[in-house]
């Protein structure tokens, strides 16, 4: 991460702050009542996409193009807008579409700004919960709830013996493989709520989150917020989280290493 870029440019956090507010207004004015659902998977399986996903992404792209017309954009629903710029935006218009479809409030809008492929600023906006998370710099992250801003930090004092751990396997790990990580499974206390669980690590409410099969738009917007709040995030085989996949986020390094060791049998 280029710390000079992070520290010298407040335009991006300001933009993300305003975007969060605009997205919440857009939802309540345009999308809260009617939407259509399609299944992306033909045949067996269920991967829903809604007209709201597409409307949100169009809105986010419009805002980015208006403010930063030369930047590249990568979105879950509409793909790539190519550019020669070193800056790119990664968009998940609705993270937790299944939650959105059934009326659960835990879905979010996720947006990151990347520099040369590395996430440097992130936003996780939760319109129904009336709050959003973002990083101001590489060392400072905030939650804004009911228009009140509060600096957030992971629980650095968390210990292995009393972990608060959430996990989402999403059917990605077979029962055969799950039998290899029974010590980890016995530590699970909470189900994952998509991006909200990562955000709760940043606030110190959870100590560990493990999620399978993350795409770049699922995790890139969370990486800068996790790092800025003092957390650790990587793949379970200790690669950079920007490569996505099976992602582990922890409140401190000792816990991270310990949980990685428990997940080692399924890391390859």
What are these regions (language model features)?
Residues 83-142:
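DPxDG-like acidic metal-binding loop motif
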């Amino acid at each position: 991460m280029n710390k000079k870029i992070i520290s010298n440019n407040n335009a991006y956090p300001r933009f993300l702050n305003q975007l969060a507010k605009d997205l919440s207004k857009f939802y309540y004015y345009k999308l809260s009542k009617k939407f259509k659902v399609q299944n992306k998977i033909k045949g067996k399986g269920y991967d829903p996409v809604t007209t709201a996903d597409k409307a949100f992404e169009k809105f986010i792209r419009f805002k980015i193009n208006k403010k930063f017309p030369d930047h590249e954009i990568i979105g879950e629903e509409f793909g790539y807008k190519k550019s020669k710029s070193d800056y790119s935006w990664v968009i998940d218009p609705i993270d937790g579409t299944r939650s959105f479809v059934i009326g659960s409030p835990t879905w979010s809008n996720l947006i990151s700004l990347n520099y040369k492929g590395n996430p440097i600023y992130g936003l996780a906006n939760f319109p129904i919960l009336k709050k959003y998370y973002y990083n101001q710099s590489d060392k400072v992250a905030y939650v804004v709830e009911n228009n009140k801003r509060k600096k957030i930090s992971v629980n650095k004092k968390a210990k292995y013996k009393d972990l608060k751990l959430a996990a989402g396997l999403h059917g990605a790990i077979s029962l055969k493989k799950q039998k290899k990580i029974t010590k980890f499974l016995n530590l699970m206390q909470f189900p994952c709520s998509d991006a909200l669980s990562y955000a709760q690590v940043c606030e110190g409410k959870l100590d560990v989150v493990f999620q399978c099969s993350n795409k770049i738009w699922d995790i890139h917007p969370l990486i800068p917020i996790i790092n800025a709040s003092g957390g650790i995030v990587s793949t379970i085989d200790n690669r950079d989280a920007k490569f996505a996949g099976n992602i582990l986020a922890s409140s401190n390094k000792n816990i991270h290493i310990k949980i990685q060791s428990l997940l080692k049998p399924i890391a390859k």
